């Protein structure tokens, strides 16, 4: 029986909330499309502070894989097709239909561009599915490769080199997009280090926890330092905020480690709520952008007080997504929409 690791339950819930906050801050920026000067720069740096959500989900996904498995069968892939890829497609169908109505455009066009090519917020699932296949291949070769410091270093060099040239070399950028058919955000070379970092941490999980018990403060200082490095490397494009950036790789990676270290100190605080957010995190990730615009139309009245705006918006989004998820959970067939984790929740029946 797998040991329940409370720190990972808290970690998944916090990362989920961080992604929602990222999208809420984006909504504020989009509302003020004429923003410029100091206000735009401030928004840019605030948004980048919490941009680590998607990289952290990639790290966490692979950490859980190498932590819980030492060998895998073909069922490893089929399970992920059923409970990750199929929900992605089904929610994508709903999103494409709603977007076709909203924009008075073709459903087929919306589905192909968004779901098949990954030109929507769900692109992250396309990345994750590629890494599941890569993980399966490595398991079949040798599980101990996940413990390779050389592979970890090479993946860092590959990711940083790819992102640097993709961002700064027009010829390289255009050549890649000419031959790669999907959204640029789904190219795994731009995320490959996060995959191997998660794998390495999962393989050495107890050692990682022991390290964080002693050196968490140092990691927090490093997180601040790497963010200042990002500031120094900023290119002046204050509208474009993305985690698909070489200058944010160290910061994103260290923030995952920092949050994991902080979560090791949580045992019971808001545990029932945290447990539900964690269990429904995949469904929340897919559903919340669909309702975000409508909800923002109300909550933006609190925009002048950013903390109040974020707190109320986060509460409503989590409440709506979990509420819908709890209703769907009553019917086992909806595991192909909400995933299988919600069915593991220990909820008393009356």
Swiss-Prot record:
InterPro entries: Acyl_transf_3_dom. Keywords: Cell membrane, Membrane, Transmembrane, Transmembrane helix, Transport. One of its GO terms (cellular component) is plasma membrane. The chain crosses the membrane at residues 7-29, 44-66, 79-101, 116-138, 145-167, 187-204, 211-233, 243-262, 269-291, 306-328. It is found in: Cell membrane. Its main location: membrane. GO terms for molecular function: O-acetyltransferase activity. It is a multi-pass membrane protein. GO terms for biological process: enterobacterial common antigen biosynthetic process. Presumably involved in the export of the biofilm adhesin polysaccharide poly-beta-1,6-N-acetyl-D-glucosamine (PNAG, also referred to as PIA) across the cell membrane. Belongs to the acyltransferase 3 family. This is Probable poly-beta-1,6-N-acetyl-D-glucosamine export protein. It comes from Staphylococcus aureus (strain Mu50 / ATCC 700699).
């Amino acid at each position: 029986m797998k040991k329940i690791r409370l720190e990972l339950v808290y970690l998944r819930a916090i990362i989920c909330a961080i992604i929602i906050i990222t999208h809420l801050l984006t909504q504020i920026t989009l509302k003020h499309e004429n923003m410029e000067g100091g206000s735009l720069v401030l928004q840019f740096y605030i948004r980048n502070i919490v941009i680590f959500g998607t990289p952290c989900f990639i790290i966490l996904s692979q950490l859980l894989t190498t932590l819980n498995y030492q060998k895998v069968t073909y069922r490893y892939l089929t399970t992920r097709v059923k409970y990750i890829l199929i929900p992605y497609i089904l929610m994508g169908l709903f999103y494409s239909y709603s977007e076709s109505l909203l924009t008075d455009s073709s459903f087929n066009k919306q589905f192909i561009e968004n779901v098949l090519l990954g030109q929507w917020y769900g692109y992250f699932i396309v990345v994750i599915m590629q890494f599941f296949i890569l993980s399966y291949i490595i398991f079949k070769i040798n599980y101990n490769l996940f413990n390779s410091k050389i592979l970890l270093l090479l993946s860092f060099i590959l990711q940083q080199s790819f992102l640097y040239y993709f961002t700064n070399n027009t010829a390289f950028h255009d050549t890649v997009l000419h031959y790669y058919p999907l959204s640029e955000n789904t190219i795994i070379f731009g995320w490959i280090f996060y995959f191997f970092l998660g794998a390495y941490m999962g393989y050495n999980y107890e050692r990682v926890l022991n390290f964080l018990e002693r050196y968490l403060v140092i990691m927090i200082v490093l997180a601040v330092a790497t963010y200042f490095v990002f500031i120094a490397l900023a290119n002046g494009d204050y509208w474009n905020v993305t985690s698909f950036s070489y200058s944010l790789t160290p910061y994103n990676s260290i923030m995952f480690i920092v949050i994991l270290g902080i979560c090791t100190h949580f045992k019971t605080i808001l545990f029932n709520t945290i447990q539900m957010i964690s269990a429904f995190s995949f469904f929340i990730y897919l559903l919340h952008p669909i309702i975000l615009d409508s909800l923002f139309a109300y909550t933006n009245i609190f925009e002048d007080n950013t903390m109040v705006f974020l707190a109320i918006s986060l509460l409503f989004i989590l409440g709506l997504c979990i509420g819908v998820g709890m209703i769907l959970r009553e019917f086992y067939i909806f595991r192909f929409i909400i995933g299988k984790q919600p069915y593991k929740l220990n909820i008393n029946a009356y």
